[in-house]
Amino acid sequence: CHDRCCRFLTAASSLIYDTYRIAVECTDPEKIARYARRLAAKEFRATDVDHGTEAVRFLSTITPQGLITYTDSVKTMCDRIYLIDDEWGAASRLLLHALRSSALSAKLDIISCYCPLSPYEKLEHLMIPTIGMAFITTNRYTNVELEPYRRIHAKRFTDMTKLKIRKQRISFNRKAAREMLDEAIRLLVEAKNIHDDIERYYISSMDYAKVNTKVEETLSKIKSITEKGG
């Protein structure tokens, strides 16, 4: 189940990335850069520390329950939430990377949240708890339910006439990606059911005291390595 699930997720990621490649050709990067500079100048108050730090996290995930974005952390740490409505993935990515750079230049601590389908390159959400601000991408995949402080529409940075020429291909990508994700989720459900069935047999034989001891030993080793800088 796991290997098949990964293959379906890879296929979905490829289709979504193809839509991004189409959309980025219809997106005005200079307009996004100007908007990001204005927004940063208004909102990002520089601190007196030497430099800002960046933590990398996942806020969204694919689970047996479907696609989930964990918004409790956002609501706890940030009271001003900018929602970026973007169904194509180009404008939001460019905007978030520009805001990330500006926030770090202002020596602010940030939390960068990447897309689980493209974890090394697609910045999906950005949180800046020190100023109570978050920038959250919304689309048919993220399933975000948050009350926005402001809403930013990707259309304002997009040549919609040019984008409509590729409407058929985008529609195909969208439907096919949805089917790939649905199948991946179905396989996750199947894998969990198999795990639960197996667990019924071995759980009563588990020595949890030994498990906890091994966990503590492993954590101690990790801590020792990190303290030595190795």
Where are these regions (language model features)?
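Conserved nucleotide-sensing/catalytic segment adjacent to the nucleotide-binding pocket
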Residues: 1, 101-182
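Charged, amphipathic alpha-helical linker segments immediately N-terminal to NTP-binding catalytic cores
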Residues: 1-61, 162-164, 182, 197, ...
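A contiguous, basic/glycine-rich beta-loop/short-helix subdomain that forms a polymer-engagement track
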Residues: 58-73
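Glycine-rich phosphate-binding P-loop
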Residues: 68-71, 77-103
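Extended, charged coiled-coil helical stalks used as long, distance-spanning scaffolds
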Residues: 175-182, 186-192, 196
